[in-house]
């Protein structure tokens, strides 16, 4: 007999979305819950901010290299639903409405992401709230998904504050079903395992059947310590997560914080490179991800905070079966030559070297 999980829900993977990891811009780490548009109009959570960012992404080249989502995090809503129970944006901060904002973003060749919160506790005690205290969605699931689809939303991040982590195994799939019912293709980003992993090992197979991507660990903060804690957690738990990751299903280590306030140039390069591959741990780390053409993306990462270090990665270690390989530095945009058996490089403190290793075919003489 098939399980109820198999019968009740259409797999989110079947939506055909997120065949590569979604890329874009999200406001939270930089702007948080700044709702003071009267005194700080350029930095508050309002339509002006997201229209400005959409313009920058389209005009400054980000869209051309794959950054396509402009995503609104918490604090966009009014504190009250409409009389018929519909979510609505704060009218003072989004005077044109969310549909108009979606239309503007789409006109730039980009896509709109939005945030909601699911509450699964005793509603008489906890209420239904997002993490910042705005209306949650547990008692309006289909209505809210229909609202998002009607606005033209392309990506949904569903958070889990005020939720019992044990109930997420049924709560999040309820939203999956509601999204599928809308008929609109919407990428589904879940926070599901991030709330469960402190207590138990999440069921990643079930999560991957219902989500396009999922957060696994704490929120990132604007600090190097936060970045390294996420990297360590991923290194410690990669055997649990790697088997289910691939086109349509991705582990989400949270936002890039490059361009904010705390990271040095080398640390920014390190986060960028590591977020691209995420596949080991130690004081000198070697991360690798196989590519579809037989090459391997490799990141050499140094935890040293004082002097540069030489780090070597054997081809066997990174999953390359060839005897020889050509290396190309992705940050320097230059070829480094042919290497035999291993690749090595000098890595700056708290820095990375990121290369593509491409097998060289040795012809018989």
Feature map (PLM): residue ranges:
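N-terminal module-boundary/linker segments of secreted carbohydrate-active enzymes
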Residues: 2-44, 186, 284
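Structural recognition of the beta-strand scaffold that forms the well-ordered cores
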Residues: 19-27, 66-73, 111-116, 149, ...
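Aromatic-lined carbohydrate-binding/catalytic grooves of carbohydrate-active enzymes
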Residues: 30-39, 46, 50-165
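Carbohydrate-binding surface patches
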Residues: 275-278, 282-320
């Amino acid at each position: 007999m098939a399980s109820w999980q198999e019968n009740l829900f259409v797999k989110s993977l079947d939506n055909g979305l997120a065949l590569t990891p979604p890329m874009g811009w999200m406001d939270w780490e930089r702007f948080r819950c700044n709702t003071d548009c009267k005194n700080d109009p350029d930095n508050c959570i309002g339509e002006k901010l997201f229209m400005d960012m959409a313009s920058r992404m389209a005009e400054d080249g980000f869209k051309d290299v794959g950054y396509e989502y402009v995503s609104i995090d918490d604090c966009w809503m009014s504190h009250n639903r409409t009389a018929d129970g519909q979510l609505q944006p704060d009218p003072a901060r989004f005077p044109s409405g969310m549909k108009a904002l979606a239309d503007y973003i789409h006109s730039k060749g980009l896509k709109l992401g939005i945030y909601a919160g699911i509450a699964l506790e005793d509603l008489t005690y906890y209420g239904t709230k997002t993490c910042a205290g705005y209306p949650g969605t547990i008692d309006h699931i289909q209505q809210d998904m229909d609202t998002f689809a009607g606005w033209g939303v392309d990506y949904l991040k569903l958070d889990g504050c005020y939720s019992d982590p044990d109930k997420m195994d049924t709560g999040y799939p309820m939203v999956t079903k509601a999204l599928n019912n809308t008929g609109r293709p919407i990428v589904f980003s879940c926070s599901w395992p991030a709330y469960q992993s402190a207590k138990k090992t999440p069921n990643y197979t079930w999560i991957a059947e219902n989500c396009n991507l999922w957060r696994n660990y704490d929120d990132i903060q604007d600090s190097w310590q936060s970045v390294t804690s996420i990297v360590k957690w991923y290194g410690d738990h990669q055997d649990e997560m790697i088997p289910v990751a691939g086109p349509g299903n991705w582990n989400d280590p949270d936002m890039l914080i490059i361009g904010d306030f705390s990271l040095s140039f080398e640390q920014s390069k390190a986060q960028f490179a590591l977020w691209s591959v995420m596949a080991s741990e130690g004081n000198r780390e070697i991360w690798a991800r196989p590519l579809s053409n037989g090459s391997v993306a490799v990141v050499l990462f140094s935890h040293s905070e004082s002097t540069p270090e030489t780090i070597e990665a054997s081809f066997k270690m990174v999953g390359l079966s060839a005897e020889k390989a050509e290396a190309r530095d992705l940050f320097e945009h230059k070829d480094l030559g042919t290497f035999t058996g291993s690749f090595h490089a000098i890595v700056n403190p708290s820095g990375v070297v990121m290369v593509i290793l491409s097998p060289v075919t040795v012809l018989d003489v």
